[in-house]
């Protein structure tokens, strides 16, 4: 371009080229400066985070691509940095929020854990308190039970002391008294244990401990009892040496009889029969050693005699004793029951006694008491004695006498005083249940009596010891235990008292042997006999009879026969009393002389006491039950009261709700009932309003018709007045006006029909051209206003004169409904059109008839006075 310009400048003016070159250079400099300024501004905007807008170069030059790319890259990086910063801030905000939420959750969890721990602690404390209260209540209960049991034991001890003091004898020495006290203490302990077993609940640990204490006390008392029995045996020994031998004297025999007990109940038996089992256990523990070590008895006598004796015993007692019970049977019953009863209570001891008595009785009874034996017991001597006397040599019989006397003497002494034995019986024998006595006593007696009797025989005559006693005891035990079980299970135990003649008649062999031993034997065996008597526990004679009165009658008959022997009874009673004292001290009882009446009195007293105690227990139980029932009833009443209050509250609420619902329903029903009434009223009102509107429309239409008729009359009058002499002009005007009038009248009639059709569509449907009868009279129709219209000559303007009111009812006529105005507007529109057409026709007529212009003008004025009036009135 520079070259072209220079070439052109060479041919033209050089000043223009220079100017052009200068201008280009100046523009380039300006562009460079602007570029530099843009770069500086961009750096400044980057530093201040302000975007710089691109300013185009004035001279049209463009930036380079690398600069553009660099700027775009910088913008992108800046944008990315901003986005990263925003993201980082958002992340930090999220982390902060999550941290706060986590801390809040941890605090909530810690709070819940703390609350749970507090609740558990409170629950644990409440449970501990409840358990403590329960333990306290249980402790109080058990202490009360123990207090009651101790009180009962104290009362029983007092009663026992009073009872033992009734028949105490003055001949007992201090040692027997101490022994009696100790034996009574053991009985009290055992009674306490039995009372605890009966009365106290077995589930308590304190009671078990008390029972264990009682057992230890019982063992201790049993050892004391054995020591006392040893001391007492020494006193027996001394007294037996001092006393003379009394032979041929009969004693009172206490028969320990089993009779079916009808009056006693199971509660009485259970209450009475516990202590016996406990009393018979201690001897068993001590005596188990002796039978196998020391038992040695006469060989043939002990082996051969028992079978027959046992057979006779059980046959007679079980089969013949109870049913017959006559006078003739009394000897047999007594003789047979003597060994049998001891078999029932202590089988082995009874076999020893029966053997020795049957072996020893024939010779001694014949030698000592010939009269008594011949008169009373021929059968016994025949049945029992022959084989025994033949088989038993004199040495054996003499050596066996100590053993016989060991068992026979205490029997006689025990049987003689009924009172003491009756007192022993209620405590020791009557209170024992059949099974317990059957199971416990045989073992105890088997292990106790052989020891004592055989110790006596060892000390008295050591040569007479035999080696067959264990075998015999085992055989007898095996043979007798089942029979004893059968008999004792079917009968309960009671006491039967017989007189001394019956003893003399029925039981001659043991008594006679006893007395003969006391006479003939040296004094050495007798102390042993008296020594062994205390430890032979319960050698009472037991006999299963059902009719006690018959046996008593038999005893009375025997009494009459044996009056000669009755003189010696006092001595025998004294001797037997002493024996009884010593034996009862070993058997844990005290002595006393009593008859059958006293024994029955004591028995009745004991039964009465047991009954009273049972009644007291029953009353206590009933009282506790009543208290429990009262507490339960009170709780039930409280629950029912609470429940009744809640139910009443609920019933009140339900009643209130029901009343509210009923009220609401009543309101709704009233509204429902009033709604159709209101609807009916609204319909009636609407119908009335519609009727009013219709009447108003009819009245207005009648007024319009009346006004039209009046206008027609007026037009006719005007036409008559305005007629002139010019006939032609009048004819033309008349024809034109008549045509116009007819057209206007036709238009008015059409408009009237349209208005009537709009107002009364039912008339059109019925095919009638007019509505029904008008109710409004024509006299009441309002008069419409009239106005005059003048047409000027040169123009077509209409000059209206001021409105004139023939009747001042325009104000009332304007007060119409929207329907009326709309109908009138529809009617007035065609009339205005017709009016314009009429005006054009009149103008033509005026132009044609220039001569009669004035007259035509007046007619047209009169005509125009009618037509626009209708349009105005309808518009109004």
From Swiss-Prot:
Regions of compositional bias (Basic residues) in chain numbering: 831-842
Superkingdom of source: Eukaryota
InterPro entries from the UniProt entry: MAP7_domain-containing (IPR051483), MAP7_fam (IPR008604)
Residue stretches of biased makeup (Basic and acidic residues): 214-244, 425-438, 465-475, 613-639, 680-697, 861-876
Keyword vocabulary terms for this entry: Acetylation, Coiled coil, Cytoplasm, Cytoskeleton, Phosphoprotein
Phosphoserine modified-residue sites: 185, 322, 441, 457, 461, 490, 524, 770, 817, 832
Residue numbers carrying N-acetylmethionine: 1
Stretches with biased composition (Polar residues): 171-183, 191-211, 510-521, 820-830, 848-860
Assembly behavior: Interacts (via N-terminus coiled coil domains) with tubulin and microtubules.
Protein name per its UniProtKB record: MAP7 domain-containing protein 3
